[in-house]
Amino acid sequence: MKLFKAEQWNIEVLLPLFEAYRQAYGQAENPERTLAFLTNRMRFNESLFFIAVDENEKAIGFVQLFPRLSSLQLQRYWQITDIFVLEHAQQTEIYAALISKAKDFVHFTQSNRLVAELAQNQYSMLESEGFKLNPKERLFELSLSC
């Protein structure tokens, strides 16, 4: 398995995986709109993706990060809103690798906070990666030291 930060030229690798993610949450297939959504997120630096690919270069998982700013803390932090792994024998390990890559990126950008707003069925995965539920904000948070 390889993990890498997606760029615009990787959208065709990400597109079928992102469509599978949307369909897993009950959304109708719409590759044209999905392509436009992904293209615009990357083009305007509104979010970034890390993609996991298997030995055949097929995308098997991704995590999407959005930059956030805290006026009170005077710093940037990152938010995971989407993480998805295809049904796979090593699904737990792939999720962990994607979260680890996100943590590394947060360190790289000299941020010290990563929050996640995910489906309830992913709560245990977040907790196993050190995230704590902040009931006031209904988000999982992970503080990282730079």
UniProtKB/Swiss-Prot annotation:
It holds the Pfam family Acetyltransf_1. Residues 1-146 form the N-acetyltransferase domain. Keywords: Acyltransferase, Transferase. One of its GO terms (molecular function) is acyltransferase activity, transferring groups other than amino-acyl groups. Transmembrane segments: none annotated. It comes from the Bacteria. This is Probable acetyltransferase HI_0677.
